Structures are given as structure tokens and as C-alpha cells.
Amino acid sequence: MAASPKINRREHILQCLATMLETSPGQRITTAKLAAEVGVSEAALYRHFPSKARMFEGLIEFIEESLLSRINLIMDEEKDTMKRCQQLLQLLLVFAERNPGISRVLNGDALLGENERLRSRISQLFSKIETHLKQILREKSLREGKGFELDEAVLANLLLAVAEGRIAQFVRSEFKLKPTKHFNEQWNFIQQQLLQS
């Protein structure tokens, strides 16, 4: 008889938390509800995480590792400015779409009433993403000798705001309005405007 695979309880707790964020939009997740979902006592939850804030930090670490590692790949592998920007924004939107519960963390919706350091950490993540966009846009002028009419920081902020807006719509629609819907058409329009400047 084969041994059953050992469940990584910590990962299982985080998966259940993400699922609950997806299936209970607008509702606060309590440790009692989470323990019931996981099938353990609240005390068992606290053996793996000292607080609910640490559980959310576990999700944020997953978000950071997933997004930033892929952004670094885009930066290394793609050299075309417009393709880099498109791929970075598309990565963010696809990640949110594939992880609806986690998109509530990205959006900040799931962090209302939680520890301030969680919202601060998500804010820092978006600052890092915006910095990558600024770098991409600045490298265009270095590589091609011609930049944009608008300051790269202003453009990076605009591009990130588009992605954040799409994620906000996704959360607000209770995951019905996909963030990638019409992205290619929208990107083509944005790209044309950027290249004309």
C-alpha cells in the first residue's frame, strides 16, 4: 500500500485562505472560519502562523515571488520597450485573473481592517512594479536616442493605473469582468499613442 502524500499544512492553509477570499467577496475572513475550511482547530492554525496577519503575509510573499521573478525574466529576455511594457502589464492582469482571491489582496479589498503593514507591503510591491516600468521606458531613450514627450515616471504611473483599474473592476464585479478582456485592443491603442509622442 502506497503512503499518502504528506500535506504541507502551511501551504494548505494559504490555499484555503485564497479560496475563501475568492468565494466570499466582501466578507471578512476570521480565523474561526478559516480553521473550519482547513479542517483544523484555530490552535492548529496558530502552530503554523502566529497571527492572521502572518497568513496574509504568506499570500503577499507568494504574490511578490510570482510577479517579481517573472518581471525579471521579461527584463532579461525582451529588449523591445513596447513588448516589455505589454508583457509586464499582461503578467499582472493574467496573474490576477488566475488567482481571483489573491486579486482581492492586490486590490487591498481583503486587507481592510487588517494590519497596516500588509497594505504597506502591497503598496511597496506596486512601487517596485512602477519602478520597473520607469526603467523600461527610460531605457528606450538610451537605446534608441529618442524618448517620449511625457516624462517616463508619468507614463509608468499611467500604465500601472490602467492595470490596477482592471484589477479593481475584476474585484468589484465579483470576478465576472476579466481583467484581460479587451486588453490587447486597449494596449494597441495605448501603444499607438505612446509611439506618436
From Swiss-Prot:
One Pfam family from the record: SlmA-like_C
Coiled-coil segments on the chain, per record: 109-136
InterPro entries: Homeodomain-like_sf, HTH-type_Tx_Regulator, HTH_TetR, NO_SlmA, SlmA-like_C, Tet_transcr_reg_TetR-rel_C_sf
Keywords assigned by UniProt, alphabetized: Cell cycle, Cell division, Coiled coil, Cytoplasm, DNA-binding
Stretches assigned to the HTH tetR-type domain: 7-67
Name this polypeptide is given: Nucleoid occlusion factor SlmA
DNA-binding region(s) in UniProt: 30-49
Gene coding for it: slmA
Assembly notes: Homodimer. Interacts with FtsZ.
Organism: Shewanella pealeana (strain ATCC 700345 / ANG-SQ1)
Highest taxon in the source lineage: Bacteria
Location of this chain's protein in the cell: Cytoplasm, Nucleoid
Gene Ontology CC annotations of this record: bacterial nucleoid; cytoplasm
Listed GO MF terms: sequence-specific DNA binding
PROSITE patterns from the UniProt entry: HTH_TETR_2
